[in-house]
């Protein structure tokens, strides 16, 4: 018998064939249980914001400035300065952000984890983070990795003579990888013609993706699928940058500003490069891409395979990028690694070598750099920046700040002495509280006034949910604060039933005006607060209808934003194209409705039990869009009962699909054949999916009514306050 056979631990927990292997289409609830206290090593009472406030930011920056020019033998600095490397590191930390679902970005320091730490576009950034470890180690919990990565990018720019727009801390580290959809391809950098392509039609990029190939941050620098066509590349640039909230001017500023510094690396064939960090051996200690080409570092470094230095001052801020872009004609060539790039025709050798002061090179550019000259719209902006260096510097400073802070949410989350004073429209500004807030007696009186309007439980609950459920935990946007449900574009969204919404808002505005007009000490109630308060009144009334007295918690302090404080285009991405909590689908989608429900729940930071109790409660409260009866498994709507679960689990009912797409079902009495209920995939999943059924059984039990109400109120209150960072 072999020693292997004798070992009682040939296999360990978590290994072997998984449920996903057996049933690849099974609904995945794991995304609802990421980033819990179980994976967080910090003490339960640890408050990162308080820890950051104790940080000597000036001392950290001083250490970072020293690091920039302290070249390490194990990974030497190009041109004796790590600035270019650290700018790239910060850019790639933030640059995964996409507007469609708010996921990606610098917020949790996800560049430390798979898959991002091993993306082909992030080659050598493992070394950048390792260079930072002594500084992170020194300051410990007072600065997160997420904050340090962005701060280092800022300091890199400042150390090279650039004046940044500002810096805000406040990014709390995560301790495990996000579960984000980055595409369906099974091969790194798979071309668009592959079997799992993210493209359809005339190069239409799949939503929510914002990169052209698996493993890239934005675009292929050689051009679409490696085709060195600057005009075609401009299409990809415009699409991907727009999907991370950048317009043409911001895009040009970012590309030109970022490419003012440093160089790319393609000293030899990629075949010399070893496995990425997640595939490397234990002895590599989290590093990857070990190269056997020459020394494998310094002048022999292979990163992208491109060998380009854009400016004659790669460690200093200058206007050289545009000077070179427009001063030369360009001819196609290949890097030593065989990648398509461009070299200036008939040009003098004015570009310094990164490691040999006696050498000079001709200017070089990427295909995507030339897009800024040969795309008509980009060319116009580029020439303006070339002729107006101060305007270019300001545009880059602002675009860099937006890039690195876009996923942080409102300014109230910003920390530190370098937060810029200027309020920016993309931050979704909300006025500061400027009046005394309502007290408990006012809350009780306002609830009575709301109920006296004659608005139904369904109307009150639906409006409050519509206001609050725009929140996205991914980029901290949306939510009830600001009352933007009364403004364009939210007031006109189909999911919000504009005509019905207008009637509810008119009634609530009447209550608001009457209350505010009656005050003598300046006390006011905002409409944002009143919408949430009205929802609470509706929930309490529905619980009372079920025979249970309960008070929904309420904390005043929301304010009303104006239309001028609302970027209509930027707000449009928050429109729910699917909201299973309201049994709503704007269009038929390839993705099953139940998966879209889980996705929505994850953006709302809900757990599976919270998602379950909210769906069951919202159904019986009549919150469906269009007053749809699908999933309203009760004969007493407006009562906060556990009827949804009890009736769904009733074995006297037999369910059958009644639509060609298998997305609508009828529940018939097994004995008589009479139709009792209708439901959607989102409804029936709570009886079909084994884990969700287990949760439904908890709430569908005979003794569950009080627990159901209590849990519903807790989950409801959580959603109502997701954007109340002032309460955290």
UniProtKB/Swiss-Prot annotation:
Keyword terms: Heme, Hydrogen peroxide, Iron, Metal-binding, Oxidoreductase, Peroxidase
Protein name: Catalase-peroxidase 1
Free-text remark on how the cofactor is bound: Binds 1 heme b (iron(II)-protoporphyrin IX) group per dimer.
SUPFAM superfamilies tied to this protein: Heme-dependent peroxidases
Record-listed cross-link Tryptophyl-tyrosyl-methioninium (Trp-Tyr) (with M-244), residues: 91-218
Single GO MF descriptor: catalase activity
Any one GO BP annotation for this protein: cellular response to hydrogen peroxide
Keyword flag Metal-binding: yes
Sequence position, cross-link Tryptophyl-tyrosyl-methioninium (Tyr-Met) (with W-91): 218-244
Site (Transition state stabilizer): 88
Its biological purpose: Bifunctional enzyme with both catalase and broad-spectrum peroxidase activity.
InterPro entries for this protein: Catalase_peroxidase, Haem_peroxidase, Haem_peroxidase_sf, Peroxidases_AS, Peroxidases_heam-ligand_BS
Gene that specifies this protein: katG1
The family this protein is said to belong to: Belongs to the peroxidase family. Peroxidase/catalase subfamily.
Binding residues for heme b: 259
PANTHER family xref list: CATALASE-PEROXIDASE (PTHR30555:SF0), HYDROPEROXIDASE I, BIFUNCTIONAL CATALASE-PEROXIDASE (PTHR30555)
One GO CC term, this protein: cytosol
């Amino acid at each position: 018998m072999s020693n292997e056979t004798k070992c009682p631990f040939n296999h360990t927990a978590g290994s072997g064939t998984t449920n996903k292997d057996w049933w690849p289409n099974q609904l995945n609830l794991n995304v609802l249980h990421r980033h819990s206290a179980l994976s967080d090593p910090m003490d339960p009472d640890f408050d990162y914001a308080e820890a950051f406030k104790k940080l000597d930011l000036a001392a950290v920056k001083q250490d970072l400035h020293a690091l920039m020019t302290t070249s390490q033998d194990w990974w030497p600095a190009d041109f004796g300065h790590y600035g270019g490397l650290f700018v790239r590191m910060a850019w790639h930390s933030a640059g995964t952000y996409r507007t469609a679902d708010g996921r990606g970005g610098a917020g949790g320091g996800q560049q430390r984890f798979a898959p991002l730490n091993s993306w082909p576009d992030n080659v050598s950034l493992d070394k950048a983070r390792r260079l930072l470890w002594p500084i992170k180690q020194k300051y410990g919990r007072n600065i997160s990795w997420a904050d340090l990565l962005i701060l280092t990018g800022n300091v890199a720019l400042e150390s090279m003579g650039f004046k940044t727009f500002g810096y805000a801390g406040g990014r709390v580290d995560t301790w495990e990888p996000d579960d984000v959809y980055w595409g369906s391809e099974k091969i790194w950098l798979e071309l668009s013609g592959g079997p799992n392509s993210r493209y359809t039609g005339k190069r239409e990029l799949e939503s929510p993706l914002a990169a052209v190939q698996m493993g890239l941050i934005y675009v292929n620098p050689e051009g679409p699928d490696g085709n060195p066509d600057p005009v075609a590349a401009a299409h990809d640039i415009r699409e991907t940058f727009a999907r991370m909230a950048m317009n043409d001017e911001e895009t040009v500023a970012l590309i030109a500003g970022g490419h003012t510094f440093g160089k790319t690396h393609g000293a030899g064939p990629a075949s010399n490069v070893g496995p990425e960090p997640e595939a490397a051996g234990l002895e590599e200690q989290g590093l990857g891409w070990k190269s056997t080409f020459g020394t494998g570092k310094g002048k022999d470094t292979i990163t992208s395979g491109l060998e380009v230095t854009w400016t004659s001052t790669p460690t200093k801020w200058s206007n050289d990028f545009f000077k070179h872009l427009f001063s030369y004609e360009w001819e196609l060539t290949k890097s030593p690694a065989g990648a398509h790039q461009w070299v200036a025709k008939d040009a003098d050798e004015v570009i310094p070598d990164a490691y040999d002061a006696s050498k000079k090179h001709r200017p070089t550019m990427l295909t995507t750099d030339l897009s800024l000259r040969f795309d008509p719209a980009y060319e116009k902006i580029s020439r303006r920046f070339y002729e107006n260096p101060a305007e270019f510097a300001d545009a880059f400073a602002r675009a860099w700040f937006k890039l690195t802070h876009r996923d942080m949410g409102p300014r109230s989350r910003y920390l530190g002495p370098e937060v810029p004073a200027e309020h920016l429209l993309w931050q979704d500004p909300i006025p500061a509280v400027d009046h005394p807030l309502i007290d408990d007696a006012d809350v009780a009186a306002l609830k009575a006034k709301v109920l006296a309007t004659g608005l139904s439980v369904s109307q009150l609950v639906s409006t409050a949910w519509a206001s609050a459920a725009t929140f996205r935990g991914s980029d901290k946007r949306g939510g009830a604060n600001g009352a933007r449900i009364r403004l364009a574009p939210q007031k006109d969204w189909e999911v919000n039933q504009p005509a019905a919404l207008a009637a509810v808002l008119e009634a609530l505005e009447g209550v608001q005006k009457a209350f505010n007009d009656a005050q003598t000490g300046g006390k006011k109630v905002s409409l944002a607060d009143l919408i949430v308060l009205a929802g609470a009144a509706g929930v309490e009334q529905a619980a009372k209808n079920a025979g249970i007295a309960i008070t929904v918690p309420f904390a005043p302090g929301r304010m009303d934003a104006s239309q001028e404080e609302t970027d209509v285009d930027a707000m449009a991405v928050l429109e729910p194209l699917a909201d299973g909590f309201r049994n709503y689908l704007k269009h038929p989608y390839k993705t099953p409705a139940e998966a879209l429900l889980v996705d929505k729940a994850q953006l709302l930071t809900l757990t599976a039990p919270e998602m379950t109790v909210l769906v069951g409660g919202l159904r019986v409260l009549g919150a469906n869009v269009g007053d749809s009866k699908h999933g309203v498994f009760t004969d007493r709507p407006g009562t906060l009962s556990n009827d949804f679960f009890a009736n769904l689990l009733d074995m006297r009912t037999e369910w059958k699909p009644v639509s060609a797409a298998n997305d609508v079902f009828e529940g018939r009495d097994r004995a008589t054949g009479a139709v009792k209920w209708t439901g959607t995939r989102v409804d029936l999943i709570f009886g079909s999916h084994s884990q969700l059924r287990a949760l439904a059984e908890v709430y569908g039990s005979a003794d569950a009514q009080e627990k159901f109400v209590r849990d519903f109120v807790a989950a409801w209150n959580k959603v109502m306050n997701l954007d109340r960072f002032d309460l955290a």
